[in-house]
């Protein structure tokens, strides 16, 4: 069975479009927060925010890291202490705040 050229072209173009529509997250690091939208690798399923506060002074702004991640890590699996909080989400640019 021969498929028409226009049909094959439509399939190829739709595959290309799907490749460019992966998860997008903010990827950045800064005190108090940051914002830089970026496309994630295909292995990433979550956008993550990690906030780290100084154990000496809780009045300082936290160091905030935003990134793509495959899965949702928890503090204990990363070996991080009680001064770290992690939030995960699964939609585009959901790790804004």
Curated annotation (Swiss-Prot):
Keywords attached to this entry: Disulfide bond, Secreted, Signal
Quaternary structure, from the entry: Interacts with CHRNA3, CHRNA4, CHRNA5, CHRNA7, CHRNB2 and CHRNB4. Interacts with CHRM1 and CHRM3 probably in an allosteric manner.
Signal peptide region: 1-22
Compartments in which it is found: Secreted
Gene Ontology cellular component list: extracellular space; synapse
Organism of this sequence: Mus musculus (Mouse)
Function: Binds and may modulate the functional properties of nicotinic and muscarinic acetylcholine receptors. May regulate keratinocytes proliferation, differentiation and apoptosis. In vitro moderately inhibits ACh-evoked currents of alpha-3:beta-2-containing nAChRs, strongly these of alpha-4:beta-2-containing nAChRs, modulates alpha-7-containing nAChRs, and inhibits nicotine-induced signaling probably implicating alpha-3:beta-4-containing nAChRs. Proposed to act on alpha-3:beta-2 and alpha-7 nAChRs in an orthosteric, and on mAChRs, such as CHRM1 and CHRM3, in an allosteric manner.
Tissues where the protein occurs: Widely expressed, including in dendritic cells, macrophages, B- and T-lymphocytes.
Native organism taxonomy: Eukaryota, Metazoa, Chordata, Craniata, Vertebrata
Gene Ontology biological process: acetylcholine receptor signaling pathway; keratinocyte proliferation; regulation of neurotransmitter receptor activity
Highest taxon of source: Eukaryota
This protein's name: Secreted Ly-6/uPAR domain-containing protein 2
One Pfam family, short name: UPAR_LY6
InterPro entries: CD59_antigen_CS (IPR018363), Ly-6/neurotoxin-like_GPI-ap (IPR051110), LY6_UPA_recep-like (IPR016054), Snake_toxin-like_sf (IPR045860)
Matching PANTHER family: SECRETED LY-6_UPAR DOMAIN-CONTAINING PROTEIN 2, UPAR/LY6 DOMAIN-CONTAINING PROTEIN
Gene field: Slurp2
UPAR/Ly6 domain span: 24-72
Gene Ontology molecular function: acetylcholine receptor binding; acetylcholine receptor regulator activity
Disulfide linkage: 25-47, 28-34, 40-68, 72-88, 89-94
